[in-house]
Amino acid sequence: MTDNAYPKLAGGAPDLPALELEVLDYWSRDDTFRASIARRDGAPEYVFYDGPPFANGLPHYGHLLTGYVKDIVPRYRTMRGYKVERRFGWDTHGLPAELEVERQLGITDKSQIEAMGIAAFNDACRASVLRYTDEWQAYVTRQARWVDFDNDYKTLDLAYMESVIWAFKQLWDKGLAYEGYRVLPYCWRDETPLSNHELRMDDDVYQSRQDPAVTVGFKVVGGQPDNGLDGAYLLVWTTTPWTLPSNLAVAVSPDITYVQVQAGDRRFVLAEARLAAYARELGEEPVVLGTYRGAELLGTRYLPPFAYFMDWPNAFQVLAGDFVTTDDGTGIVHMAPAYGEDDMVVAEAVGIAPVTPVDSKGRFDVTVADYQGQHVFDANAQIVRDLKTQSGPAAVNGPVLIRHETYEHPYPHCWRCRNPLIYRSVSSWFVRVTDFRDRMVELNQQITWYPEHVKDGQFGKWLQGARDWSISRNRYWGTPIPVWKSDDPAYPRIDVYGSLDELERDFGVRPANLHRPYIDELTRPNPDDPTGRSTMRRIPDVLDVWFDSGSMPYAQVHYPFENLDWFQGHYPGDFIVEYIGQTRGWFYTLHVLATALFDRPAFKTCVAHGIVLGFDGQKMSKSLRNYPDVTEVFDRDGSDAMRWFLMASPILRGGNLIVTEQGIRDGVRQVLLPLWNTYSFLALYAPKVGTWRVDSVHVLDRYILAKLAVLRDDLSESMEVYDIPGACEHLRQFTEALTNWYVRRSRSRFWAEDADAIDTLHTVLEVTTRLAAPLLPLITEIIWRGLTRERSVHLTDWPAPDLLPSDADLVAAMDQVRDVCSAASSLRKAKKLRVRLPLPKLIVAVENPQLLRPFVDLIGDELNVKQVELTDAIDTYGRFELTVNARVAGPRLGKDVQAAIKAVKAGDGVINPDGTLLAGPAVLTPDEYNSRLVAADPESTAALPDGAGLVVLDGTVTAELEAEGWAKDRIRELQELRKSTGLDVSDRIRVVMSVPAEREDWARTHRDLIAGEILATDFEFADLADGVAIGDGVRVSIEKT
């Protein structure tokens, strides 16, 4: 490349992946990322929180998608003058890490961990969580994402963990952390509870499962005086037969009507509304012996199905439950308080303590001797058999099994090990979320959400129903809960620590590692024990890993022990992004802790994108291989192609996205190649490097510069509101106008080395690459550096509003010209009339034909028509067809919507000057109806976009037009021949043409037209024995003159 010439580019299609690798190598050598940060020193800061991923697995499409957004927004904000730090983080604790190590070591049980030693196990976890950091860095770098790996944070670091225990201590001091006994989702494989929000994070947490469902009669003993229930059976239905040995009560709704019916020699009680559901067992028209309101049944005593806990205080009575319905079952609900959240609440209110015969591994213990050692799911079959035969433990109290069926239903599974969960009462530590739930709802209103509906929808509704958060886990690899208790209940004491200083003060040693087992070794005498025999010991639990990540804003900088001023200036964050499931995960825990600790939101703006699916529409699966390999896509199409495919899709507006190879390649075809080809076109035809100019008077130059000004404004508007798909669409539309209109219509000017055209295109590409830089950072870097020879497009500012001349009228007119040409071209194609065949006439009917008057010749030339007629008589060639949008209008209009539809169909709808529609008794707003322009003659007429008008194409072909079309076909063939023989576009040539006799008149008539277009200074007709065949029997020879 000389100082005054563009780089010489290789011919043919560009190798985009290879070019991208060159850029990445340049960035690495140049340290461009750090330069982009440094040049904003002293500028206002834009605070981006990068949610930490787990590093014990390789990145997938979901990570790539989020990562692209995490790159685009900081790049854009940096160009807008902000300093944007991009510190990477690693989520390192929790069961994902533990399970990976268990797989590596062949561990299947917690007892094996205890046997090998917690220290050894946690050392293995530490090594595992950082196993893939190099691979992660390679992926992140390859996707052209700029992040600071050198200054990363890890949740396992001592400083990070100290901030986390500080947060717990703050909650304790505020009365917002407590220990309680609750029914929680419980993983028997991992032997630990889960929090409720973990069950709602991913769609596949609830999986279809078949369970035995039984309807069992519990025999009433005593009943109420004179109600006739003594000896009848209360019918209950359950899909968890394994909980029947723990039954302590049944619940009814006080307001539901119940009946006692005779069926054979037995009497059964159930909700009247459920009789039909049990017609097979009870008869089509059973004899009703009595009718009762649920309230009348309260206190009724019965015999439980199994007699293991017959002496349990206050048990085995009918209680009131507001959760009881008649949607399924019998209207009477079996309650085992240790295994049902509602059951526990109702039972506690009347003094029924739970029984817990199931151990931490999900197996029955000795208190249920007949099933001892069996896993609860395995015991279901034997329990059903015993009920069916009234044998074994079911023989004592005589329960009656009247139905046994298989019930398929969505059932929660552990999101980590994928085993089905149970609900089990456990002791756990909680954050008292219900105390500040209303405040969380209020603070959510200060957050800007994209999509907007997430605020009051998925996230807002979740906040409204938020329950206390179970934050303790009975595991090993995690931040310890900093609670020490006396080991003697006679001298109770609880100490909570929130810093290393506090631990050192009381234990005389400053921990160098807060992980187990080292933290567990810190003990001291109980200060409240005068005997001096009891000891303060740490509880064995660790914190929920979501507590770790939710602490990220302050823990990453070791707040409040360091960086107090920094934190105050960087909290809340300006922006975060993750997938929609994090409304139950990271978004949620950030919000909980921010509200509890600081009474502020943790973030100002959040993008919650949809889910990336495999090409079969299912969740991506390695075993199914239902998605393109990421590395192969990078190697074949490049990162910018992947970025464009993901960012231009509806997924950032909350929809899901199916990944296909064709979809990725479409981005190359629609945007990347057109941008590259435009740059290549300029480099090929410009005799020297263009200069910045915006003063050309040529209408096409003025148009593309004004169109670029519109792009600048549109992109700015979209990026300011994080509408990245909208920004991509604006760029795609501009690229279409640039390549398929401006460059194509200006080719002859470039061939003539027109300085206005060259300078204008140079200027347009220079600005376009800056505007596109956040969206397509690699290809824009190549083009920018080739255009300007400057260091990097990513070290430039966002184009200013007054940088380019604007001309709204010209843009509107030329855009309509393009629409006219597009519609007419579609008609020509439908009629199968080739492009080079001239046609006699095009009629353009628009509201303001004067707008198009200056462009009549351009339209005629573009469409190859002899005459263009402009008119405002739209109704001559078509009509507007009105339809009512019933889905929108219906809720407001009610029954009047049908009258409106009828009026519109009858042609009685009238559009008012204000845009409303009068239709029968109703007045519809513009969004409640649709207006579509319909052509009177669809074969020759087409509507313009948005009902702007119509075009009518006369497809009559005369002999004269056919002859001219024949000549233009030959011109195209001769141009291709020039190109294939290596002639320069400006070379003059000599042509000898041999034409069949039947075409000789056509050839001679249009000799000058042909010669002029192909730059032939000498053109003659003669018979050729050899020469090159170019079509329709024509042979030619050409040579440079």
Curated annotation (Swiss-Prot):
In which domain of life is the source organism classified?
Bacteria
Q: Where is this motif: 'HIGH' region?
A: 53-63
Localization: Cytoplasm
Q: Which UniProt keywords apply?
A: Aminoacyl-tRNA synthetase, Antibiotic resistance, ATP-binding, Cytoplasm, Ligase, Metal-binding, Nucleotide-binding, Protein biosynthesis, Zinc
Recorded hits in CDD domains, A to Z, give: Anticodon_Ia_Ile_ABEc (cd07961), IleRS_core (cd00818)
UniProt EC number: 6.1.1.5
Gene Ontology terms for molecular function: aminoacyl-tRNA deacylase activity; ATP binding; isoleucine-tRNA ligase activity; tRNA binding; zinc ion binding
Report the Pfam families cross-referenced here: Anticodon_1, DUF5915, tRNA-synt_1
What this protein needs as a cofactor is: Zn(2+)
Q: GO BP, one example? A: isoleucyl-tRNA aminoacylation
Where is the motif ('KMSKS' region)?
619-623
Q: Which reaction does it catalyse?
A: tRNA(Ile) + L-isoleucine + ATP = L-isoleucyl-tRNA(Ile) + AMP + diphosphate
Q: What's the top EC group for this one? A: ligase
- Listed GO cellular component terms? cytoplasm; peptidoglycan-based cell wall; plasma membrane
| Chain positions recorded as ATP binding sites | 622
Asked if the Swiss-Prot or TrEMBL record annotates the protein with the keyword Lyase, the reply is: no
Cited InterPro entries: aa-tRNA-synth_I_CS (IPR001412), aa-tRNA-synth_Ia (IPR002300), Anticodon_Ile_ABEc (IPR033709), Ile-tRNA-ligase (IPR002301), Ile-tRNA-ligase_type2 (IPR023586), M/V/L/I-tRNA-synth_anticd-bd (IPR013155), Rossmann-like_a/b/a_fold (IPR014729), tRNAsynth_Ia_anticodon-bd (IPR009080)
Q: Which family does it belong to?
A: Belongs to the class-I aminoacyl-tRNA synthetase family. IleS type 2 subfamily.
Instruction: Explain the purpose of this protein.
Output: Catalyzes the attachment of isoleucine to tRNA(Ile). As IleRS can inadvertently accommodate and process structurally similar amino acids such as valine, to avoid such errors it has two additional distinct tRNA(Ile)-dependent editing activities. One activity is designated as 'pretransfer' editing and involves the hydrolysis of activated Val-AMP. The other activity is designated 'posttransfer' editing and involves deacylation of mischarged Val-tRNA(Ile). Confers high-level resistance to the antibiotic mupirocin (pseudomonic acid A), an Ile-analog that competitively inhibits activation by Ile-tRNA synthetase, thus inhibiting protein biosynthesis.
Q: How does it assemble?
A: Monomer.
**Record's comment describing the protein's domains:** IleRS has two distinct active sites: one for aminoacylation and one for editing. The misactivated valine is translocated from the active site to the editing site, which sterically excludes the correctly activated isoleucine. The single editing site contains two valyl binding pockets, one specific for each substrate (Val-AMP or Val-tRNA(Ile)).
HAMAP family tied to this protein:
Ile_tRNA_synth_type2
Protein known as: Isoleucine--tRNA ligase
Species of provenance: Mycobacterium tuberculosis (strain ATCC 25618 / H37Rv)
Gene name of the encoded protein: ileS
